[in-house]
Amino acid sequence: MPNTTTPNTALQTVCLTFYIHENQQHHHTLLYEWLLEQAKKNGIWGGSAFRAIASFGRHGQLQEDHFFELGGNLTIQVIFFVQEAEAALLLDLVERENIVLFYTRTPVDSGYTSPHH
C-alpha cells in the first residue's frame, strides 16, 4: 500500500503527554479539564484525556479501577499533537502555575490518509 503522506505534506509535530491523577485539581477544577481548557484558550487545535484502568508510578503503588470508587486516583493522560512552539507554550503555562507534572514529549510525523480532509 503506498504511503499517502509524503515528506512534503507530513506535519512535523510532537506528541506532548501529561500524566495527571484523576482527582488532581487546580483552581477548584479537575486538572485535566483545566489543562484542556487552557490549551483551547491558547489556540491549540485539539487535545484528549484518557483514563487508565490500572496504573502504578514511581512509588510502586498499584491503583486499579473499582466500581465502588468515586473520584479515584488513577492516571489520566492528556495528549496533544502540536508544533514544538505550542508544546513549549503549554509547558511554560504549567510551570507558571507552579503545577508539578510528569510529561513526555516525543517527535512524531503526522498527516492525513486522504487529501480531502
Give residue spans per PLM region.
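Positively charged, small/polar-rich N-terminal and surface patches that mediate targeting and assembly
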Residues: 1-117
